[in-house]
Amino acid sequence: MRLPIFLDTDPGIDDAVAIAAAIFAPELDLQLMTTVAGNVSVEKTTRNALQLLHFWNAEIPLAQGAAVPLVRAPRDAASVHGESGMAGYDFVEHNRKPLGIPAFLAIRDALMRAPEPVTLVAIGPLTNIALLLLQCPECKPYIRRLVIMGGSAGRGNCTPNAEFNIAADPEAAACVFRSGIEIVMCGLDVTNQAILTPDYLATLPELNRTGKMLHALFSHYRSGSMQSGLRMHDLCAIAWLVRPDLFTLKPCFVAVETQGEFTSGTTVVDIDGCLGKPANVQVALDLNVKGFQQWVAEVLALVP
């Protein structure tokens, strides 16, 4: 039986690969997509997501979400993904539009209609998920679990300790981590290992039309290089859903720092139980890299 999922995303070049896997992995049933400001503005992430859905002729409803964080000024990652978020490929024009309601309400409505609890996957800042929990707390029993790409048990990638998706809206992340829902965190500890090799990247143009498109996008992606390999951060959240055996997880207490002058956005991961608090997150700490790379190749070969 395919696993029903809703995907909250901020495309973003590595998001494009994650979206492809979410649509075409035979184990998954992607039923709803929502966008959030993150890598670029929410107008751009929505445009990019609609372009990808049209490219793959995927009839999946999409709702536009939060344009700004809960309480602070927005930040982006255009330096990594380019000003448009997905530069490098000329997508054809289309007439697709997002749903007429905000993302958190679209998630609420879809959860309430679902015959069983649904897995949420968030690969951008957690603003939409926090809004859902704050505005629609009655939805919590309908969430099977939340799988996120975000956070780190060690070093960060936008401050010394903070990972971008959490640092972009620390208050939202803190709300989500305190919520009591089941959370799996695929942070930098594993995503920095999730590298597609130069040899594999070179084969993409001959793979299929998606391979050609991704290869063009990757030439503008700044999380690694075509010569040294590219990190597929967001894809790890999808990979865990399909191949949890590739990941080493540990239950930990995790809090999000929202006040520190130098540490705001840090995920404080209590690996050794020093704080004596009950675990609230399953934290991915290690990855079977070769197994991950093999799975990626298998999935992308299924994409038209």
From Swiss-Prot:
Q: Pfam families attached here? A: IU_nuc_hydro
Summarizing the function annotation, the protein's role is:
Hydrolyzes both purine and pyrimidine ribonucleosides with a broad-substrate specificity.
Print the keywords alphabetically.
Answer: Glycosidase, Hydrolase
Q: Which organism is it from?
A: Shigella flexneri
Entry GO terms, CC: cytosol
The record's section on InterPro entries has: I/U_nuclsd_hydro_CS, Inosine/uridine_hydrolase_dom, IUNH, Nucleosid_hydro_RihC_nonspecif, Ribo_hydro-like
Its EC number(s): 3.2.-.-
- Name the record gives this protein: Non-specific ribonucleoside hydrolase RihC
Gene Ontology molecular function terms on file: purine nucleosidase activity; uridine nucleosidase activity
Locate the active site. Answer: H233
Q: Upper taxonomic classification of the species?
A: Bacteria, Pseudomonadati, Pseudomonadota, Gammaproteobacteria, Enterobacterales
Family annotation (PROSITE patterns): IUNH
Matching Gene3D superfamilies, A to Z? Ribonucleoside hydrolase-like
As for family, the record states: Belongs to the IUNH family. RihC subfamily.
- Name of the top EC class for this enzyme: hydrolase
Q: Give the matching NCBIfam families.
A: PRK10768.1
| GO BP terms in the entry | purine nucleobase metabolic process; purine nucleoside catabolic process; pyrimidine nucleobase metabolic process
